Structure formats: C-alpha cells, structure tokens
C-alpha cells in the first residue's frame, strides 16, 4: 500500500547502467550475512551447535570507541565488541565472561523512543567517505543478525539479549564487519543510556529501513540484554553460496514460511558485499541506499551469468557486469514456490512493502518473551506497536 511508504527519496545514481532504472542514493555496506559456516543443502537433521568458533580469551576493550574509518573492515577491531557503560556501570565488559546490568525502559514513552530514532537518523550520513555515504544498510544488517539467530526448536537466540556484544558471537564469520556497526550504535547509547542494546539495535533497523524510503515498521520495546553465556552458536544465519533447501532450513527454524523468506530477501535492495568480509563482491542494485522493489525486478528481468573470477561463486548482470546476485538470490527464481512471490513483488512495490513490513517486524521480535512486551502495553498507541515518523515527515510537519 502506498500509504506504507515513508518520506522523500532523493535520486542519486550509483553508476551508469545499461538500463533505465530509477536510482536513489548509493551505499556500500553488506546487508546480509553470507560468510558464516552453515549446514549445506540439503540440510542435515540437526543443526551444528558451532561451525568454526573456538574458545576465546577474555579481552579488555576501549569504551565508547568512535565510529568511523573502515566501517566494515574485517580485522582485529571487528573481533572486539565495543561496549559502553550503561546505567550503574552496566555493559562494561566484553568476552566470554562478560556481564550486563538491566536497563530500565518501561517508564519511557513513544516520544522518548522517537528521540532515539531521530538521533540514529541524523547520523546515517554523518561520514560521506564511508563506502557510498550511508550507514543505513549496515544497521539493517546489524538488526538482522541480532534477530536472525533464533531457533524455535530450542527457543534460543533472537533479538532478546544483544549477545553479539560478546565473544564468541562477535567473532562469527557472518558478523564480520559489524563491530563498527555496534560502535555506531554505542554512540547513540551514550546519549540514551536507559535503552537496552537489544531495543536499540532493532530500533536502528527500523530507522534505517524507513529513512531509506521503505515502509513503516511497527516496533515494540521490551527486549532485555543478556550475558555472554547466552551467545548463540555459529551457523544459524544464511550462507550465500547455498540453494533453496538451505534457505528453508535456516528460515523455517526461525518460524518463517516461503513467502516471508522472499519478502525478507528484499532487504538486498540495500547495500553490497565485500571481499574482505563475506568474500562476495558488489551491490545487488544500482541504488543501494534506496529501499525499493528493484531487487525483484532485476531478478526477473535481467540476464544473470556466473562471474568468472577468483572469488566464491556468484552471478553478475549481463548488461553492465557491475551488479551481483548470490546463489541464494538466484534460488528465489529457480524454486517455483519462491518464484511466484518474486513475480508478485516485481510487479507491485506496494505488495512487497506490505509483506516486508509484517515479516521484518516479526523478525525483530524473535526470541522475545511475550511478558517482556506486556510491561509496555500502556505506553503503546492504543495497545498497538509504535510507528515512528521519518525525518522527512517531521520536517514537513514544521
């Protein structure tokens, strides 16, 4: 529905294309998580509790490190969770024995959370030298990775906990480059120490989607931070070089169906892959800082060939050889159950936005006990989740 779209979308082409695409601001960060070892295709009966992560030594960290530089560099800095000091010294420690203190958020109103949203939105383009100029896509990736670890069979993982602050989860291959994303959010947390990291990271994902032109995402507060012993095992996030069976294996454990898998894959409208993180290279679309249905249009209408290079298997567009698709992306048009939804979303951005809105809101609440949200029911809009005004909407209202 058109009413779900938000704010102004400023067009700024990423590069010349051989086709007449509607372009929007460009970005360079990878939105998804294709480097963590995961079960192959077809999936095994039981997931591995850990693919490659060994025990790590406790490490002291610098508090409130500045976000900047090589935002997604996969090096030493990415293997350290940068943690700030919350209320009463909470969240000071990093490592396998780290501990956190509870943050009190039930007393805060929608206006308080809107202020947090605004602070995030104001900093999305704070560093024009970072990749293609926006932190938005990497915040979507952070929210995704913090939430997509949920396993409904064991009822573990998910957005409740923000355990990526600690090793070994911070060192999982799928989380390469996200240390700086956490650093970005740490600066926001310093301004609003009352909000839990779990709520902050998911709210950041909401702000990024909306500010980049996507639909309004309903959101509820109530997530609680956890300690390092609650870190999820490696291998719970999708691997980009797999097929449809792997996608179903990963997403079904979270509780998603085929339609929701395709809708959530539409987040690949944003960002790009990097060889020094996932091993893959390039953006999915010509305007990777704009949330649109162009990802699905390209899947359906562009000709894709296997790229000849020294990296892992991926596809490139025939027209310009500047775009890429992963094996998991192509699986969406190779599998009939997935393809029918790709076709729908390619034809109608409104349908895509409506379905993505629901699936993404569901993703951001995975693993959160129902009682956590009940404490906030009196603060919600008539008992309904919050929907936040975009920067453009607030400017137009003044």
From Swiss-Prot:
Source species, domain of life: Eukaryota
- What GO molecular function annotations does the UniProt record carry, in alphabetical order? cytochrome-c peroxidase activity; heme binding; metal ion binding; peroxidase activity
Bias kind Basic and acidic residues: ranges: 222-240
Q: Which reaction does it catalyse?
A: 2 Fe(II)-[cytochrome c] + H2O2 + 2 H(+) = 2 Fe(III)-[cytochrome c] + 2 H2O
Kindly give the SUPFAM superfamilies that the UniProt entry links to this protein. Heme-dependent peroxidases
Keywords associated with the record: Heme, Iron, Metal-binding, Mitochondrion, Oxidoreductase, Peroxidase, Transit peptide
Q: Where in the cell is it found?
A: Mitochondrion matrix; Mitochondrion intermembrane space
Q: Where is the active site?
A: 145 (proton acceptor), 284 (tryptophan radical intermediate)
Locate the region Disordered.
Answer: 19-53, 217-240
Q: Would the keyword Ribosomal protein turn up in this protein's UniProt record?
A: no
Top-rank EC class of the record's enzyme:
oxidoreductase
Give the matching InterPro entries: Ccp1-like, Haem_peroxidase, Haem_peroxidase_sf, Peroxidase_I, Peroxidases_AS, Peroxidases_heam-ligand_BS
Sorted alphabetically, the Gene Ontology BP terms of this entry are:
cellular response to oxidative stress; hydrogen peroxide catabolic process; response to reactive oxygen species
Q: What does the note accompanying the cofactor annotation read?
A: Binds 1 heme b (iron(II)-protoporphyrin IX) group per subunit.
Task: Give one Pfam hit by family name.
Answer: peroxidase
Transit peptide: where? 1-34
User: Key word Phosphoprotein present in the record?
Assistant: no
Primary site of residence: mitochondrion
* Cofactor(s) for this UniProt protein: heme b
- Record-annotated site: Transition state stabilizer: 141
Q: What is its EC number?
A: 1.11.1.5
GO CC annotation:
mitochondrial intermembrane space; mitochondrial matrix
- General function of this protein: Destroys radicals which are normally produced within the cells and which are toxic to biological systems.
- Similarity section: Belongs to the peroxidase family. Cytochrome c peroxidase subfamily.
- Subunit info? Forms a one-to-one complex with cytochrome c.
**Which protein is depicted?**
Cytochrome c peroxidase, mitochondrial
Q: What gene is it encoded by?
A: CCP1
């Amino acid at each position: 529905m058109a009413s779900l779209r938000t704010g102004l979308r400023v067009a700024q082409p990423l590069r010349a294309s051989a086709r007449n695409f509607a372009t929007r601001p460009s970005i360079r960060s990878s939105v998804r998580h294709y480097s963590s070892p995961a079960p192959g295709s077809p999936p095994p009966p039981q997931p591995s509790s850990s693919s490659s992560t060994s025990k790590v030594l406790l490490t002291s960290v610098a508090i409130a490190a500045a976000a900047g530089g090589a935002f997604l560099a996969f090096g030493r800095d990415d293997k350290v969770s940068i943690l700030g000091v919350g209320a009463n010294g909470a969240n000071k420690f990093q490592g396998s024995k780290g501990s956190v203190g509870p943050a009190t958020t039930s007393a805060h109103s929608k206006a308080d959370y809107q202020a947090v949203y605004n602070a995030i939105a104001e900093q999305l383009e704070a560093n024009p030298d970072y990749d293609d100029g926006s932190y938005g896509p990497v915040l979507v990736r952070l929210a995704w990775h913090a939430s997509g670890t949920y396993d409904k069979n064991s009822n573990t993982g998910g957005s409740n906990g923000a355990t990526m602050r600690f090793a070994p989860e911070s060192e999982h291959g799928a989380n390469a480059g996200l240390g700086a994303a956490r650093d970005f959010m740490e600066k926001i947390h310093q301004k609003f120490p009352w909000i839990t990291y779990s709520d902050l990271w998911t709210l950041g994902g909401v702000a990024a989607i909306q500010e980049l032109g996507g639909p309004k995402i309903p959101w509820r507060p109530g997530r609680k931070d956890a300690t390092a012993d609650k870190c999820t095992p490696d291998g719970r996030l999708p691997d980009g070089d797999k097929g449809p069976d792997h996608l179903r294996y990963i997403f079904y454990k979270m509780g998603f169906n085929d339609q929701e898998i395709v809708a959530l894959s539409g987040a690949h409208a944003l960002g790009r892959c990097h060889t020094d993180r996932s091993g893959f290279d390039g953006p999915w679309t010509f305007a990777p800082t704009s949330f649109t249905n162009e990802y699905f249009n390209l899947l359906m209408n562009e000709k894709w060939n296997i790229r000849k290079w020294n990296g892992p298997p991926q596809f490139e567009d025939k027209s310009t050889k500047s775009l890429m698709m992963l094996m998991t992306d192509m699986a969406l048009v190779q599998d009939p159950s997935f393809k029918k939804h790709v076709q729908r979303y390619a034809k109608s951005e409104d349908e895509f936005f409506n379905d993505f809105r629901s699936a993404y809101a569901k993703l951001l609440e995975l693993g959160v006990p129902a009682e956590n949200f009940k404490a906030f029911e009196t603060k919600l809009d008539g008992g309904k989740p919050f929907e936040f005004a975009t920067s453009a909407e607030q400017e137009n209202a003044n």
